Amino acid sequence: MPSKKNGRSGPQPHKRWVFTLNNPSEDERKKIREPPISLFDYFIVGEEGNEEGRTPHLQGFANFVKKQTFNKVKWYLGARCHIEKAKGTDQQNKEYCSKEGNLLIECGAPRSQGQRSDLSTAVSTLLESGSLVTVAEQHPVTFVRNFRGLAELLKVSGKMQKRDWKTNVHVIVGPPGCGKSKWAANFADPETTYWKPPRNKWWDGYHGEEVVVIDDFYGWLPWDDLLRLCDRYPLTVETKGGTVPFLARSILITSNQTPLEWYSSTAVPAVEALYRRITSLVFWKNATEQSTEEGGQFVTLSPPCPEFPYEINY
């Protein structure tokens, strides 16, 4: 009779599962190779029964980083897989799945009985992904307990992600109350968007989000810092207690002023250095008047034009 817990039926979540798949198709083989290796402490799949008179099948063993439900394992590996809770050690399962010497996939390493794997697994994830965010998502408890050590390891490992792309820069200009911040909020998934704290140099809470919003900007970042943010080269930004790599693919700058007004012409050597980094200029249809959101619309300009008589994005 299926076990029940919290009103749910079916096998309880486990870390270690074995599975068999008879007569696998190429699509089914591909699916079994698709799950990211960061899911597993150890994963092995052998191909068996290819000689005449036997049923071709895949024989696999998965030791997941964290417990998985029966249905989740089916989702990862394929609905036709026959799945059971694993018995024996990782090494014994490795020997069983590889007994015919024809492996479809093997990743990770067999775990020993009682082996401490939380920190070592988090380290493996970190060195594989180069991302503290990935570690935090997959190993939250270990991340909280070992954040500083993991951060230092990332710095000295050479695995830290670095920007090697041009960050797109979108400037949204309009009077107060026209909906600039709403425009920025709707640009991308909130999960991947970081709102820069205003009027200071700190980037506390930034963890490599792909979209950065600099809201209500009027020149309060140092000129050189703004140019570096809007460029294409590796950059780290300061947090209270350390630095993090800047990995934004898009920067949204909202302002009541045009870029012409952000900095004094006597304070910057060549304002064109900023203009050529701007990807697009989005203006309220009449940015010189106090308008409500219902009374106008945002328009993407094609500079040089009357509203902004300088070339951009070159």
UniProtKB/Swiss-Prot annotation:
SUPFAM superfamilies named in the record: P-loop containing nucleoside triphosphate hydrolases
Motif (Nuclear localization signal): 4-18
Residues annotated as signal peptide: none
Keyword Metal-binding: yes
Function: Essential for the replication of viral ssDNA. The closed circular ssDNA genome is first converted to a superhelical dsDNA. Rep and/or Rep' binds a specific hairpin at the genome origin of replication. Introduces an endonucleolytic nick within the conserved sequence 5'-AGTATTAC-3' in the intergenic region of the genome, thereby initiating the rolling circle replication (RCR). Following cleavage, binds covalently to the 5'-phosphate of DNA as a tyrosyl ester. The cleavage gives rise to a free 3'-OH that serves as a primer for the cellular DNA polymerase.
Family, as annotated: Belongs to the nanoviruses/circoviruses replication-associated protein family.
Name of the protein: Replication-associated protein
Organism the protein comes from: Porcine circovirus 2 (PCV2)
Lineage of the species this protein comes from: Viruses, Monodnaviria, Shotokuvirae, Cressdnaviricota, Arfiviricetes
